[in-house]
Amino acid sequence: ASRGLGDVYKRQPQEGKEGQEFYRYERLVIQAIIRYGEKIMCNMEDEEGKEIPVSVIEYVVNDLKEDDLAFHNPMHRRILTEAMTHVHDSGFIAERYFIAHSDPELSSIATELASDRYQLSKFHSKTQKITTDEERLFELVPLLMINFKNAIVAAELKHIMYALQDPVNEADDEKCAALMQRYKAVSYTHLRAHETRSN
């Protein structure tokens, strides 16, 4: 699996990440974990060719690992780690578990995300009946992850463009060439990730 996106993510400036678009997508992914984490969203073949059910939690964890990514917010990382630890516990329901969590900060985040019942997606059938998020997890969760990753790349490309416009860098041919090379590398990583997922 490509580790390029992880490198892109780690290179970004730390300040003000909460205001960036990818942080909003990160929050949407965590919202899906809180609401539907234990739900089975698809089946995948294991190494022996057997179909195994994959929960929302497991899908997100595996998808992040593929690109060497982690969530920026420490509480989001903790939610995902604890969710993965307990996903196979008998009777585990992510929303109930996190809302009743002993850590008040974590419980507060979970309560806020669970109580915001804005539908993450708006899928309509031919009868114009609105299909709920839970019925479309196999489409919704991969889309949330793609949007999250796309936003990471977009933020990095924007950061490079600002650096290229800096007069100090403009006057330094070597620095300029290095930035252009980095821009191409990030764009290529982004393109390869898209090709891998569309095949």
Residue positions per predicted region:
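Single conserved hydrophobic/aromatic residue that forms the stacking wall/gate
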Residues: 1-9, 190, 197-199
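Non-catalytic protein-protein interaction segments used by genome-maintenance enzymes to assemble
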Residues: 3, 7-92, 110, 115, ...
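Bacterial replisome coupling helices
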Residues: 65, 74, 78-192
